[in-house]
Structure formats: structure tokens, C-alpha cells
């Protein structure tokens, strides 16, 4: 594939890591941040000390705070902002020429809609989109360690182009057309990672964590099937792959947030200690609202949402789950 110009909108750890990957394989990559001071620091240090310290930028990775200029000068546009900022970004940018891809995992907090629904409302239902998801920590991608991802799209031609853009010796990309399933996996797994962190923080051990992962997978699959997703998506990289990674490894900020809650650290202090956006905290209420709308039981997510809103404490949430009526698996 000919080398392209990429606009990466969002200079957190994940957006930066993927920008580094794309630049390393030869694409000119514009890394946008809304914060001019952040951009100046990245340009000065040729790295992102705030979110991905110690990993140098390739020469063709260029920080910028000019959103419109980045989009207009790019062949491909990728969004990597947190889910609560996604709507603001797509409403500010001009319509990209090729399509729009995103790394963001979550749902819109205002409308409870999937991010693909927001894009369809803004740019049209036939506008090419792609969602990139799967088990992937930023530091490992930035260091060129082996990673496998799922790329879901509504347009096979655009999907092929995005596949060629990303695919390399260190990143293997698998294709899907299940946009609903891939997006739900990315949102729900963060809530379940908080649950696993809480369990470990309480000292409940490996058995409890395995149960939370397994029953959590059942919850997210039920929700997905009720919304038209395919079951095999939840058994793939975007589903069980990302779920296991996020629930078991302390690189996950959602899991670390849960660990702190399990150790009775207050929510504001736990967020402060994490120092970055905890998507599961932002998306718990939205996922529960979507589940209620679709008449789907999601007891783990419901207990985490109740805990985050001060209705129950960590020990209570676990007790409520363990005391539920017996049922068939």
C-alpha cells in the first residue's frame, strides 16, 4: 500500500500508541490533541510523556492542535478520544473523504447510542465506517509487540483499505461486519474489568474472578444478541479476547480502578490515582439503560453501576450477586 497521511484525533495512550505504529510503518501521522500545552510538550520531547512516557516518536509523527487542518490534510481519519468526547469531535470535523474509523470503546453518555449511530446521524447511514477493537494494551503496541485486532466495517472497500493501513508483521487484523457486537464488547468489558478488580481488591481469589469473567461474557452476549449482533463476535478477539486481557492484567486502568474500590478507596481518589479516563465508570449507567430498554438482565453490570452511584458498597455488590436465585447456566 502507498504511504498515506493519517489524522489520529486523540493523544491519550491508545491513540498515541496506534499513531506510533502507523508512523513506524511509514505513514505520515498527525497526532491531534485539544490541549496546546500538551502538543508543545510532545513536539519538544518527541514523545508523549503524559500518557506514554519513554517511547520516542518516529520523525513522521507530528503533534498538532489544529483539528480541522488535521482532518482536511489527511487521507484517513481515526478517532481515539474517550467515548464522552466522541460526539463533540464528530460534530466539529468536516466530513472525511474516505470514511471514518475509531479506536474509542464505549457508548454515547447523552443519548445511550452506539458510536456508529452518532456517525450515521452526522454523516449518513451509508457513510463508510470502521471500528478497531480487540485485546491490546497501548505500551505493547507502541513497542511493536505482537497484537491481534478486529476491524469491523459497513463497507468492504473501506474495510480493505483500513486493513492494508494497519496490518503489519506485529499487528494481525481480522475482519468483521458485526459493528454492533464489536462496539458492545468494547464497552461492556470495561465494566466487567472493574468488577474483577473489585473482587481481587477484596481478596476473593481466582475462582471468583473466573466466575465474573464467564458470567460477564454471558451478560454481554445476551445484550448483543438482543440488538442483532452475532454470537461468534463475543467468542472472538473483540469479545472474550479483550475481556480476559482487561480483567486479568494490571495494565488495564479499569481493573486497577476496581482494585482500589475493593480496597475501600473512595471513587474520586481512585480516579485521581488512575490519572486517565476510566471508561467503565463512564459507561456503566449507559449500558444498564440499554439493557433495560432491551429487557436483558445484566446483574454484574447493574451491581457495578449501583456501586458507582453510591447505592451499594463493594462487599454488598458481591453479596447481592451471590444471593441471586439459582438458575440454569
Curated annotation (Swiss-Prot):
UniProt cross-references to Gene3D superfamilies, sorted A to Z: N-(1-d-carboxylethyl)-l-norvaline Dehydrogenase, domain 2 (1.10.1040.10), NAD(P)-binding Rossmann-like Domain (3.40.50.720)
Keywords annotated in UniProt: Cytoplasm, Lipid biosynthesis, Lipid metabolism, NAD, NADP, Nucleotide-binding, Oxidoreductase, Phospholipid biosynthesis, Phospholipid metabolism
Metabolic or biological pathway: Membrane lipid metabolism; glycerophospholipid metabolism
Highest taxon listed in the record's lineage: Bacteria
Cellular compartment(s): Cytoplasm
InterPro entries the record matches: 6-PGluconate_DH-like_C_sf (IPR008927), 6PGD_dom2 (IPR013328), G3P_DH_NAD-dep (IPR006168), G3P_DH_NAD-dep_C (IPR006109), G3P_DH_NAD-dep_N (IPR011128), NAD(P)-bd_dom_sf (IPR036291)
Gene Ontology MF terms in the entry: glycerol-3-phosphate dehydrogenase [NAD(P)+] activity; NAD binding
Disulphide bonds in the chain: none
GO CC term (a single one): cytosol
Enzyme class, UniProt record, top EC level: oxidoreductase
HAMAP family, sorted: NAD_Glyc3P_dehydrog
Membership in a protein family: Belongs to the NAD-dependent glycerol-3-phosphate dehydrogenase family.
Function: Catalyzes the reduction of the glycolytic intermediate dihydroxyacetone phosphate (DHAP) to sn-glycerol 3-phosphate (G3P), the key precursor for phospholipid synthesis.
Name of the featured protein: Glycerol-3-phosphate dehydrogenase [NAD(P)+]
Species of the source: Legionella pneumophila subsp. pneumophila (strain Philadelphia 1 / ATCC 33152 / DSM 7513)
